[in-house]
Every structure is written in structure tokens, then in C-alpha cells.
Amino acid sequence: MDQELMRIGVSLPDNLLDRFDNIIEKRGYSSRSEGIRDAIRNYIMHYEWMNEVEGERIGVITLIYDHDQRGLVNNLTDIQHEYMGMIKSSVHVHLDHDNCLELIMLQGEGKQVKEVAEKMMALKGVKHVKLTTVSPNTEL
């Protein structure tokens, strides 16, 4: 598959680039570009998978965030209050001096479950968000 390649520039913090380079080496990529292309493909697949949330869904949002980020805790709380009818439970864990982990279990229309995760994802100071969903009607 011969596709024209486009050159882009990316600015990253040193520690993130170091971790990425370590993964590149361990996975045997021939270059950073190969690793970045693979990471972008995975990101696109994850995004497309997240958009397949039709109907009733049970979800878990996993967040890691900097609790010292000004206004972040209040913004996260406001989002949770906005969707209080969907949120069944949440667990808060202090990971270290700067970082907290939050698990939020919710149930509702898939598009709204995704909306909650996306609102949290957009907040400054949120370092990681992962949404996992299942259908409550899944036959085993």
C-alpha cells in the first residue's frame, strides 16, 4: 500500500517522549514515525469503538487527574451532579501527592454515557480517561 506520507511536527514533554521511545525500542519499530502511525491508528480505532454506544449501556469511566489543577475538582463534581441520575457509584483513590484516580460507574443511554466521559476528557488537568461500556442486555 503506497500512500503519500505527510510530515507533521509534534511537541511532547521529555518524559512522555522518553517513555514512547522506550516502547518503540521494545516493540521493534524501525522509527518513531512507525510508532506514531501505529498509535494514531489505535487512537482512531478506540475513538470509533467509543462511538458505537447505541442503546442502554453500563459504563465505567476511569480518570487519572492532577487534583491541584485549579478548578478541576469542582468541574468534575459539576459534571457528576449534572448526570446524577445516571451515576450509580464512584470511587476516589489518592495515587500520590499530585494524582488521583476516580472510577465512575454509570448506566443510561449510550450517547449520554459517552458524553459524560468526553466532558471529563476535555478538562485541563485530566491526564487519562478510559470509558468501558457493556450492554445490560448481553446474553452470555
Curated annotation (Swiss-Prot):
Gene3D superfamilies: ACT-like. Chain A, domain 2, Met repressor-like. Keywords: DNA-binding, Metal-binding, Nickel, Transcription, Transcription regulation. Its cofactor is Ni(2+). Binds 1 nickel ion per subunit. GO terms for molecular function: DNA binding; DNA-binding transcription factor activity; nickel cation binding. Ni(2+) binds at H81, H92, H94, C100. Pfam families: NikR_C, RHH_1. One of its GO terms (biological process) is response to nickel cation. InterPro entries: Acetolactate_synth/TF_NikR_C, ACT-like_dom_sf, Arc_rbn_hlx_hlx, CopG, CopG/NikR_regulator, Ni_resp_reg_NikR, Ribbon_hlx_hlx, TF_NikR_Ni-bd_C. NCBIfam families: PRK00630.1 (NF001884), PRK01002.1 (NF002169), PRK02967.1 (NF002815), PRK04460.1 (NF003381). Transcriptional regulator. Belongs to the transcriptional regulatory CopG/NikR family. HAMAP family: NikR. This is Putative nickel-responsive regulator. It comes from Methanocella arvoryzae (strain DSM 22066 / NBRC 105507 / MRE50). The lineage of its organism: Archaea, Methanobacteriati, Methanobacteriota, Stenosarchaea group, Methanomicrobia.
